[in-house]
Design a protein with these regions (language model features):
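Catalytic-core regions of glycoside hydrolase
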Residues: 3-144
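Structural beta-strand segments of beta-rich domains
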Residues: 183-187
């Protein structure tokens, strides 16, 4: 009834804000569920569930589902869940967990047609839904479920290691071989994210703290200068597209000598002598 819907929203707003207030350094996560916070746990999607998910996200939450691989329209991972994942893709991290415990659930009754005695079918279904949702993390649970992933579907584990989450790298970096003392250095870089997901630098708990930085390293492997490219934002890199940047450092006032140039993603507050 109307009172239930009002109370659900008030309680969810209160509890998510409370957690966000006290857990400021680690990501927070809530299930995206078609009957989120409702007295029932299955059935058609509640018309207010989508706005409740959005409320939790606005209060600093990521989202997860523990029904991946379940295709029942009443309580599985179906059209509503897929739409939520698509809506928030690359905006917040999505975490997957499989719905079936293959050692105790009758997964062969699933509409997907999983074969009895073939848990690898379930793992494949979970993996395929994870790829569609562009999940950042896969939760293999514990015990027998984890063993099943490694024993029944290890090739899928290997695929996620190479394809899932975020996979950032600079495929092109251009710096001059020589510069004059006191001159500026122009640095060009091109970055790609080869993973399904994205680098969640935009989370309020991280607050864009990870930056692309250019360093000059001396013969003792010590960074003598570190310059941050403020226009380079890793959370925007998605779908293997190239993202190119060029920035110019302030004057490099180092003694003449040989230095190794290094470009990396780091948390600048952990470094000394940062220049912008």
């Amino acid at each position: 009834d109307e009172n239930t819907e009002t109370v659900k929203r008030e309680v969810l707003d209160w509890i998510t804000k409370l957690y966000a207030k006290h857990f400021t350094k680690v990501p927070l996560v809530i299930n995206y569920h078609r009957v989120l916070g409702h007295p029932t746990s299955q059935g058609t999607a509640n018309p207010n569930s989508e706005s409740l998910v959005a409320l939790a996200i606005s209060n600093g939450y990521c989202i997860r589902s523990d029904a991946f691989g379940m295709n029942n329209s009443s309580w599985g991972y179906s059209t509503w869940e897929k739409a939520i994942a698509a809506q928030w893709r690359y905006k917040v991290p999505i975490i997957m967990e499989g719905g079936y415990i293959v050692s105790s659930h009758s997964y062969w009754n699933d509409p997907a047609g999983y074969r009895q005695g073939h848990p690898e079918d379930v793992r494949q279904g979970e993996f395929d839904s994870s790829a569609e949702a562009r999940v950042n993390m896969m939760d293999f649970r514990v015990g027998q479920e984890t063993e099943s992933w490694f024993n029944d579907a290890f090739s899928l584990v290997q695929r996620f290691v190479s394809e899932g989450g975020y996979r950032l790298y600079p495929d092109q970096v251009i710096v001059p071989d020589q510069v004059s003392v006191g001159s500026r250095v122009k640095v060009a870089s091109r970055w790609r994210n080869m993973g399904w997901g994205y680098f969640p630098n935009n989370l309020p708990q991280w607050n864009y703290k990870y930056k692309v930085a250019f360093a000059l390293i001396d013969a003792s492997d010590k960074a003598q200068k570190v310059f941050v490219d403020k226009d380079c934002e890793p959370s925007t890199w998605v779908e293997s597209k190239p993202f190119s940047y060029t920035f110019e450092t302030p004057a490099v006032d180092l003694p003449a000598g040989k230095y190794l140039s290094l470009i990396h993603i780091s948390e600048p507050t952990r470094h000394l002598r940062i220049s912008y």
